[in-house]
Amino acid sequence: MTQQNAQSTSEPTISENDLIAQRHAKLKQIQDVAKETGKSPWPNTFKREHYAADLQEQFKDQSKEQIESAEHVYVKVAGRVMLNRGSFMVIQDMTGRIQLYVDRKGLPKDTLETIKGLDLGDIIAAEGYIGRSGKGDLYVHLEGFELLTKSLRPLPDKFHGLNDTEVKYRKRYLDLIVNEETRKTFEIRAKVVAGIRAFLTNERFMEVETPMMHVIPGGASARPFETHHNALDMPLFLRIAPELYLKRLVVGGFERVFEINRNFRNEGVSTRHNPEFTMIEFYQAYADYKDLMALTENMLEKLAIDILGTTDVPYQGEVFSFKGPFKKISMFDAILENNPQFTPENVGDREFLAKFVREELKEEVKPGFGLGKLQTIVFEETVETKLRQPTFITEYPAETSPLARRNDDNPHITDRFEFFIGGRELANGFSELNDPIDQAERFQAQVAEKDAGDDEAMHYDAEFVEALEYGLPPTAGEGIGIDRLVMLFADAPSIRDVILFPHMRRKEG
């Protein structure tokens, strides 16, 4: 057969606009019938009593013969039509899928005609009794049926699915309908959040809520989003971190607090960064950073077991062990371990590191950059991506840790850690700075850096310093990125895969 003949005998392709027009025509028929009978074309009186997954679980051990020989079990289900073959359909609800058997001899003619005219994506209610096919599939033997919602747009072709990444992000509702893996990802996300909440609540932490709009951006080094309060005629900033408010609560006597909420940072978008993201921050009085490292080990190990059933977490071709204790190493030693060309003297030499950053890393060295800032740059550029298995990096420079407590033995470093896995930072924690005089001086140093051109340096927060002057007990605090943690448990390559509605560039037109 020639190419021309093959094309001439192929099925004509129906455009999406034509399919939409056909569905609108069907809706018009439904509306006309509803008008004649006095019923609503969008009924809302059906009450579902059963879910697909529950029925699959309930009858999983019963054979076709056992089900047929027993008394009929009647059920009421509802869901979206994912397959319609005339004699049987498949509907999908929030828990999974189940078949509906259409008995042509036992149903009225008008019901059969309605079923025949169903489109994929329509939402229906069904009543009947449980059965099992010769192939072993559980089904509902249809005795009652109602169209609840007419779908006016066709679902993606079942053979090609929804594979366009941008469409998946922009139309997440469509992605959730047709892609089971996407639904599983967000079920994992819900379990992660619930698991963290339960773990901390069990440890006597109290969940709180703090402001999302701040008069002064603080709590982290980042560029904020700015807005304006019309009634008060004043600028406000979407929060970059809740830290300074949570520590005020510890001053007030809430000795163990946590908050799960959004932070906003007016920075770049990548596979690891979204301008709006979810964090868990928690603070514990009468504890230090070592206590929080232990708590983090216990919490992550429990999450892995509860969600995945194992402490071996597969991620993008690697396997990460969430079985504690995790590796712990200072930033200074991590730089040496991953840069064999360096000596301890090199890592402690500002001029040497400044030259290395300029000439080897090709990054600008501003006049205000001290030794600690340069060490941090070298660490971020030469070490971070090599930290594959769970690792705590400790002893961060005081220069880049304006809210952390100085180490008692070495005032140039702080009692701080960052937690890395798969080459990515997942958590940041430290013994809190509770010396109001030292805090004021560090805020002043940050202001000087901001004046020198560092957009991410912190502002001076006089109200927070005043709160510290009333007395903050010895305290440790930590923040964990929920989105990045979900990426690990869901084996998702991009942060956009674990955020229901990630930020996208506005479409032209």
Curated annotation (Swiss-Prot):
PANTHER family, sorted: LYSINE--TRNA LIGASE, CHLOROPLASTIC_MITOCHONDRIAL (PTHR42918:SF15), LYSYL-TRNA SYNTHETASE (PTHR42918)
Classification via Pfam families: tRNA-synt_2, tRNA_anti-codon
Localization in the cell: Cytoplasm
Alphabetical keyword list: Aminoacyl-tRNA synthetase, ATP-binding, Cytoplasm, Ligase, Magnesium, Metal-binding, Nucleotide-binding, Protein biosynthesis
Cofactor info, note text: Binds 3 Mg(2+) ions per subunit.
Amino-acid positions noted as binding Mg(2+) 2 in the UniProt annotation, renumbered to this chain: E425
Catalyzed reactions: tRNA(Lys) + L-lysine + ATP = L-lysyl-tRNA(Lys) + AMP + diphosphate
Residues holding Mg(2+) 1: E418, E425
CDD domains listed in its UniProt record: LysRS_core (cd00775), LysRS_N (cd04322)
Family, similarity comment: Belongs to the class-II aminoacyl-tRNA synthetase family.
Protein known as: Lysine--tRNA ligase
GO biological process terms held by the UniProt record: lysyl-tRNA aminoacylation
One Gene Ontology CC term in the entry: cytosol
Cofactor annotation: Mg(2+)
GO MF: ATP binding; lysine-tRNA ligase activity; magnesium ion binding; tRNA binding
Organism: Acinetobacter baumannii (strain ATCC 17978 / DSM 105126 / CIP 53.77 / LMG 1025 / NCDC KC755 / 5377)
